[in-house]
Design a protein with these regions (language model features):
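NTP-dependent small-molecule kinase module
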Residues: 133-198
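Hydrophobic/aromatic beta-strand patches that form the interior of the parallel beta-sheet core
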Residues: 28, 76, 121-123, 171-173
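A glycine- and Lys/Arg-enriched "phosphate-lid" helix/loop adjacent to the NTP-binding pocket
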Residues: 85-158
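A basic- and aromatic-enriched beta-loop-alpha substructure that forms the phosphate/nucleotide-
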Residues: 60-98
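Conserved substrate/cofactor phosphate-moiety recognition/catalytic segment
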Residues: 21-59
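Conserved nucleotide-binding/hydrolysis micro-motifs of P-loop NTPases
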Residues: 32-35, 80-82, 127-132, 177-180
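Single conserved hydrophobic/aromatic residue that forms the stacking wall/gate
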Residues: 1-7, 12, 199
Length: 200
């Protein structure tokens, strides 16, 4: 059973870990620590945006293929859909990715999408800009401290637009008021909802 958490990586990574641990699910995480482009990207988004997005798209497609061949329940903290519907268009709209690169990227994604099935459940964790900034400061990653507010705002707006048109099974969690880590009642409420929707 494939499950996907979507939303800002600052809001969903810990949630993915907790859900996987609680139910013995297999967790697939966004490849951040060994990403050869990430630090360069945050220092010069225009120069490295296409390289980074292709890197993520490649990793994500490999994950999709692997997950589709597994009989286990797998939860993933970033989806191939977000790359093409959120991040690449946001970079293009902000002038951080050229039209040539964006069209090339989109063509590649459309080909991959023709081979991809929707997950059994998509879980969108909605976080406000102030909440995202809190997460960034708590994580303390140097390269994230230079993130522009307009960049975060653009991502949030695109998430909302995409979620409105998403055709698969969807669950929305308020990331501002739901505390997975420190409030067991919040965690139980969300997990009960997930289990009722996926019928494990």
């Amino acid at each position: 059973i494939p499950l996907r958490l979507v939303g800002s990586e600052m809001c969903i990574r810990d949630s993915t870990k907790m859900l996987a641990k609680r139910y013995g699910w297999i967790a697939h995480f966004e490849p951040v620590d060994n990403n050869p482009y990430l630090e360069d990207y945050y220092n010069d988004m225009t120069r490295w945006s296409f390289n980074l997005q292709i890197y993520f798209l490649n990793k994500r497609f490999r994950d999709v293929v692997e997950i589709s061949q597994s009989k286990d329940t797998i939860i993933q903290d970033r989806t191939i859909f977000e790359d093409a519907r959120i991040f690449a268009p946001n970079l293009y709209d902000m002038g951080l990715m050229s039209e040539r690169d964006f069209n090339n990227y989109t063509d590649l994604f459309d080909l991959m999408l023709s081979l991809v099935k929707l997950p059994d459940l998509m879980i969108y964790i909605r976080c406000s800009i102030p909440r995202l900034i809190d997460h960034i400061q708590q994580r303390g990653r140097d390269y994230e401290q230079t993130m522009r507010i307009d960049y975060l705002r653009g991502l949030n707006e695109r998430y909302e637009e995409w979620i409105k048109t998403y055709k698969g099974h969807l669950m929305i969690v308020d990331g501002d008021t739901t505390d997975f880590q420190d409030n067991p009642q919040d965690f139980k409420r969300v997990t009960d909802m997930i289990l009722s929707l996926i019928h494990i």
